Amino acid sequence: MARYLGPKLKLSRREGTDLFLKSGVRAIESKCKIDTAPGQHGARKPRLSDYGSQLREKQKVRRIYGILERQFRNYYKEANRLKGNTGENLLVLLEGRLDNVVYRMGFAATRAEARQLVSHKSIVVNGRVVNIPSYQVSVDDVIAVREKSKKQARIKASLELATQREKPTWLEVDATKMEGVFKRTPERSDLSADINEHLIVELYSK
């Protein structure tokens, strides 16, 4: 499946919630009618079956993190293989992606922008350039903006914007140095309560 390149707000309207696909400079409610489905008439969303709800939740999470279907399924398989709660394991794996960590640290305004920074070799992990967005960050890893990329206006703007967001407690960031440390693995209570990972587990368990 190809990566979606269409209007980002359309995806948020389809899921009925902010997927954080835009920078967040303006509230999403000021940009679109988030509580109505996309389309000319913005029809009300029909009541979903159990399967429909499970599928929608999977699509929502997949779109939040910008993951393709095959990648997402592989993450689920890995989460299921690990000890502990499969749903929580899935979210932890997604949060540990380098592009997500770059976004969480405030070096990028969106995960898509973070993915681009990583792919363009603007990010170093423990002093070495890593250009794989799906790279799994480990505890105590130091993630930083590459020296020659620190002058990029979009990175400076993103760090300024990040001051308006809640700071993740599992990360330690020095905005002046443009670097941060992955202090610990996030717990479920650290992550969004708007995600129902149990529905995803039910979907893939069939």
UniProtKB/Swiss-Prot annotation:
Q: Which CDD domains match?
A: S4
Keywords in alphabetical order, please: Ribonucleoprotein, Ribosomal protein, RNA-binding, rRNA-binding
Note whether Transport occurs among the keywords: no
- Say if the entry is tagged with keyword Ribonucleoprotein: yes
Which InterPro entries has this protein been placed in?
Ribosomal_uS4, Ribosomal_uS4_bac-type, Ribosomal_uS4_CS, Ribosomal_uS4_N, S4_RNA-bd, S4_RNA-bd_sf
State any single GO MF term.
rRNA binding
Residue ranges annotated for the S4 RNA-binding domain, each copy included? 96-156
Cite a single GO BP annotation.
ribosomal small subunit biogenesis
Outline the subunit composition: Part of the 30S ribosomal subunit. Contacts protein S5. The interaction surface between S4 and S5 is involved in control of translational fidelity.
Recorded family membership: Belongs to the universal ribosomal protein uS4 family.
Q: What is this protein called?
A: Small ribosomal subunit protein uS4
Tell me what organism the protein belongs to. Answer: Glaesserella parasuis serovar 5 (strain SH0165)
Please state the gene responsible for encoding this protein. rpsD
